[in-house]
Amino acid sequence: MEFEKLLRLMVEKGGSDLFITAGVPPSMKVNGRVMPVTKTPLSPEQTRETVLGVMNEQQRRDFAENHECNFAISARGIGRFRVSAFYQRNLVGMVLRRIETNIPTLEELKLPEILKKLALTKRGLVIFVGATGTGKSTSLAAMIGYRNKNSTGHIISIEDPIEYIHQHQGCIVTQREVGLDTDSFEVALKNTLRQAPDVIMIGEVRSRETMDHAVAFAETGHLCLATLHANNANQALERIIHFFPADRHGQVWMDLSLNLKAIVAQQLVPTPDGKGRRAVIEVLLNTPLAADLIRKGEVHELKPLMKRSTEQGMQTFDQALYQLYTQGEITYEDALAHADSANDLRLMIKLGSESDADHLSSLTQGLSLEITDDDPAGRRFR
């Protein structure tokens, strides 16, 4: 199949990634699942020809020298793609990631309403966490899009790579890509405050220096949005503190208690029909009580606080999974498979079912059954 047809098929099917590797057919990832798009495996020669064919001369020289090359390509009438070319077992391969220009909305993603409030907040640090491929970048793009439509100001993003292209709407949106527009996150962040930002988005916090910048931006009155690899809010705080030496831990806990706005953790769970995935969201808000626990480093006390603070907009993964299961959005098996505590969620579902049954029983007490002529089934409540 021609390479351009592969790209077009990827877009039509809603694929996120296209894999070109010798020995297997061209494959794409759709809704988190990798599937072949042809039956014929690619030969080493076909793979090499395809990979080198999307590069310019400079990129070919860089690839020959470094055995790695990252760049973007545009296909007219199809879209833009981020390319990562590499060698594996002395053979050439590449993965293409589709760069989205259609930013999904918070409503389309069915994300909690509290994210709208967080998107418009004036200052503070909001951290999205989750494993690779859990939709952090998509949710963050939706928040940026909401801010862009409903506010004014200057939004600066530093990403590696840029995954969504934002158009200027209410805000001016400056998007800088590491490796193309700047040498590193650290270099870009050092100069960001000179560019009069209102919102700063850091594609990924990978180091102590980047974390220092994120906290400093919040301290100086900016809204800083960032992503971090962690499974839930508690793990995110533990990961942050371990960026720093022990003699700084007390100060870091204090800084987080004063400047953290929220930690939003995310998973993706398949829908019952297998045709899509639903975001499952955990939300920790830095309320006065949460700030006090963070300042003391009592991370283990945050989960119980989240459980009893749903009216303020907080929720745990297990509470979110319970809601999605009761709404028929996910299956029982998938809910348990993604739970922080399968036993707790199982009990929550059991108690919820018993509560519903008790409520129905109380409603029907004292009612009598009467068969009427227009009720052939004989089961109308009077």
Curated annotation (Swiss-Prot):
Coiled-coil annotated spans:
none
A single GO CC term for this protein reads:
cytoplasm
- The superkingdom of the source organism is Bacteria
Consequence of gene loss (knockout): Mutants are hyperfimbriate, retain surface pili but have lost twitching motility. In a mouse model of acute pneumonia, a decreased colonization of the liver is observed but not of the lung relative to the parental strain.
Q: Does the keyword Nucleotide-binding apply?
A: yes
Write down the InterPro entries for this protein, in alphabetical order.
Answer: P-loop_NTPase, PilT/PilU, T2SS/T4SS_dom, T4SS_GSP_E_ATPase
- Enumerate the residues binding ATP: G133, T134, G135, K136, S137, T138
UniProt cross-references to NCBIfam families, sorted A to Z: pilT_fam
User: What's in the domain note?
Assistant: The N-terminal region is responsible for proper localization to the piliated pole.
What is this protein identified as?
Type IV pilus ATPase PilU
